[in-house]
Structure formats: structure tokens, C-alpha cells
Amino acid sequence: MAAHIIGSIGGTQADSVPIKRALLSVSDKTGLVELGKALAAKNVELLSTGGTAKALRAAGLQVQDVADYTGFPEMLGGRVKTLHPKVHGGIMYVRGNAEHEASVKEAGIKGIDLVVLNLYAFEATVAKGSDFETCVENVDIGGPSMLRSSAKNHRYVTIATAPSQYAELISALNKDGCTPYSLRKKFAAAAFAHSARYDATIASWFAGQLASEPDAAPTLLTRSCELSRPLKYGNNPHQKPAALYRPLGSTEPFRVRNGAPGYINMLDAFNAFQLVRELRKALDLPAAASFKHVSPAGAGLGVTLNASECKAYDIADPSSLTPLATAYVRARQADPLCSFGDFAALSDVVDELSLIHI
């Protein structure tokens, strides 16, 4: 059966949209007051909930509680705050569409042009080792609903989901009190990514709770990743474009100082890094490795070369080598044919003698 596809809805096509009313509801209060003051300076009406409203009022800002705006109090211990037609209607209606404009006017709904929110700290709750019920209670419902409503209607509504976005938002407002479409579209993409990561974290955690045994593998595993770096190409030169992504919140163990590595280069780097790190930790000796096409052509330790090794490796005086240089010579000369054009890894800061042999 063919899927039913909803057609687009016609409305005003404007690049710059003035911010007249904003709804702020955040768990992370970083930068909140500064943003609130910037909005107030542009005569933006502020709507808010709970602790966010309290923080804004403490800074001397005038705020209307969402409950007062909707005429419906928060209920169920805060579980239901913003799930109301006056909130979602104000976010979702298409500006300039006659039917939508008539509907919101009849219902007494005011337009909401900016939504600033972040979600309950579910991941942090799990990381603390909280019990099942506490983790479930920290699954946000109203936040993701507003986030998706705002991001969907980004043609007219700006959605900010992180304090790191506030500076760019304030800069845009300071120009003319508006946000450009390019910013709204960019922030909407970030919002959908934020929502996807949030739901992926919950889904993976929940799947783990269903495991038959404590050490059993979960039946579902979802990951969210971000761009780490573009790559020269994939496995082979014709595989372009190519890029490396890393799980959100993680970092690479090293930096690329110059050049544009390909996919195999990065695999060599990651594997060689792990090998020399483990050798250094396990044996407490400088270590080196020579990698080619994700396989070690050789690995060496900083142990003084004997006479036969010096002859084989063409080393006149082994005492002239530092332990790290010795480790590199051992790794590189283990199979010099296979090491041709290799990726070299060393466990310590490269000294002059090691560099000479490299």
C-alpha cells in the first residue's frame, strides 16, 4: 500500500522573521539570563515554565508563565506543562495561510516565534546509576514535542537547543530583531539531530533493560555520530566523497597535523596507536609499530640490539640509538619489504635520533 504523503502548505515566504514572542524552558541555565536580557532589549515577550521562569525573574526580567498564557495549570507533578494547543498552535501555524490565521485567531492563540529549550538530562541520570523508575521519569516528553514542532515550522520559528547557539542568535537579533532563514534552517537541523540522539540513547538503554542476563548483548543498539574530518577518499581513490564520523561526545586520540588522510590511513593510525600504547603500558618500554593496510608489518621495543641484529639492520653502533629509536628500527626492519610506504607509530615523544631513522 502506497504511503500517504502530506502536501506542503502555502504561506508567507520571508527570509527575515521578527521575534516578538519567545518561549524558554531549559534544564541547563547556562547563558539563560544573558539571552533573556538580549530578548527583553528587543521588546520580546517572554513565556516560560518552572525553574526557567524563576531564574529569569530573579534577573529582573518580566516573564509570563505558560500556565497563565494557556489558562491551564501545570499538572501531574510537572509531567504536563507545555502540551497544549495554545503552545503548539502558536508554534506550528503557517504564517500568511488564511485558514491557519483564522484558526489561531478564533482560538485566541498567539504566535510563538522563538523556542529555547533543552531536554531532561536522561543520559546523565543513567550515568549516575539511577534506578529504572528514576531513569524513566527523566524521559522528556514536552521538550521533544516543542522541539520537533519548532524545527518542522522553521520557515517561521527559530529553535535553539544549546547554550552554544545563543551568541549567534543574539548577534542576529541585535542587527534588526529578526532571524534569517539560513540560521533557522541550521538550528532546525541541529534540533532534529539533538532529538534523534536523545531518542537513540533512550532506545538503547531500554533495550538493555530487556536483556535476559546482565551481560547479554542488547537487541537494539543505536548511535549518533558527528563529523570528525573529511577524508581524502575511502578504501580506494575512486570512493569519494568520504568522511570520518565519531560518536557524539567522544574525541580522537590524536591530531592530524597536516595532509589529508584517507580511510585506510586512519585505520592504520587507530590500530597502530592502540598497539604501541598497550605495549608501552604492559612492558614499560618504548614501543613502535609499522602498519600497512591495517595490519602490523612489524612491532618493536626499546631493547638494545645485539651484534647479529645490528648487522641485519645496518646499524654500526647500537649505543648511538635511543631506546625509542631502537624500538622504531626493530619495527621498521622486521619486514622492510612489507613496511614500504607504511604508517609508523611511536609510544613516546619523537626524539632526534628516532626522527633521523624515520
Show the residue positions of the predicted features.
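Gly-rich Lys/Arg/Thr-decorated short loops/hinges at beta-loop-alpha junctions or inter-strand turns
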Residues: Q13-K20, K81-H88, F122-S130, S150-A151, ...
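Glycine-rich nucleotide/cofactor/substrate-binding loop typically near the N-terminus or early
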Residues: G51-F122
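Structural motif
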Residues: K20-L23, V44-E45, Q64, H88-I91, ...
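Active-site loops and adjacent core secondary-structure elements that bind or stabilize anionic groups
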Residues: S164-L355
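A short, charged helix-loop
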Residues: L114-E137, I141-T179
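Anionic-ligand anchoring segments at beta-strand to alpha-helix junctions in alpha/beta enzyme folds, i.e.
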Residues: S48-R57, L61-L83, S295-G298, A307-A325, ...
